């Protein structure tokens, strides 16, 4: 369970950023985001486990760069949208597309794929582990979107800028952690 919670922390931070960008997201939007992130986060260790040692060395060389680049681009897009935003009353409610959520979910789950690779070498039930990671991520992301909503209501039109900075921060932390290992 500790592994599952650890794997979901990046997704939680990204979800807070997403929640700040959504004007008054409903619980259904938070659940939708949680499901997308949870499914992706639960599947990536399975993919990593299946790849096993075949691609471990090559994936480890660039996984952090992919995550950093995706989160940087998504963060910059959110900041740009925030800078262009009009007053909250004049802007339509935002609903993040499936593909935008999936890209963010994938970027925050690359580390789970690497964990899956390492799990291929130990005696572990990968299905239970992957399900626990997916469930923990679902719960953390759903909570993160709602926390982001509170921050967004306080921050007003700056919420999307803050959300973009949060995504860029998550990407930077991922890059830093891998470069200093």
From Swiss-Prot:
Domain of life, per lineage: Bacteria
Chief subcellular location: membrane
Stored Pfam families: Mntp
Keywords: Cell inner membrane, Cell membrane, Ion transport, Manganese, Membrane, Transmembrane, Transmembrane helix, Transport
Membrane topology: Multi-pass membrane protein
GO MF, any single term: manganese ion transmembrane transporter activity
Keyword check for tRNA processing: no
Compartments (UniProt record): Cell inner membrane
Transmembrane regions: 35-55, 59-79, 102-122, 126-146, 161-181
UniProt KW Disulfide bond keyword: no
GO cellular component: plasma membrane
Family according to the record: Belongs to the MntP (TC 9.B.29) family.
NCBIfam families, per the entry: PRK11469.1
Biological role stated in the UniProt entry: Probably functions as a manganese efflux pump.
UniProt protein name: Putative manganese efflux pump MntP
Native source species: Nitrosomonas eutropha (strain DSM 101675 / C91 / Nm57)
Gene assigned in the entry: mntP
């Amino acid at each position: 369970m500790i592994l599952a919670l650890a794997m979901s922390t990046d997704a939680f931070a990204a979800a807070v950023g997403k929640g700040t960008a959504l004007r008054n997201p409903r619980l259904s939007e938070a659940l939708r985001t949680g499901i997308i992130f949870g499914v992706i986060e639960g599947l990536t260790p399975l993919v990593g486990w299946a790849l096993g040692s075949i691609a471990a060395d090559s994936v480890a060389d660039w996984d952090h760069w992919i995550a950093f680049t995706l989160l940087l681009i998504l963060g910059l897009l959110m900041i740009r949208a925030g800078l262009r935003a009009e007053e909250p009353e004049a802007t339509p409610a935002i609903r993040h597309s499936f593909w935008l959520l999936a890209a963010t979910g994938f970027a925050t789950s690359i580390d789970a794929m690497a964990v899956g690779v390492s799990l291929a070498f130990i005696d572990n039930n990968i299905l239970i582990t992957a399900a626990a990671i997916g469930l923990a991520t679902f719960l953390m992301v759903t909570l993160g979107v709602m926390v982001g909503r509170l921050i967004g209501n306080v921050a007003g039109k700056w919420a999307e800028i803050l959300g973009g900075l949060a995504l860029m921060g998550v990407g930077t932390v991922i890059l830093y952690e891998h470069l200093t290992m």
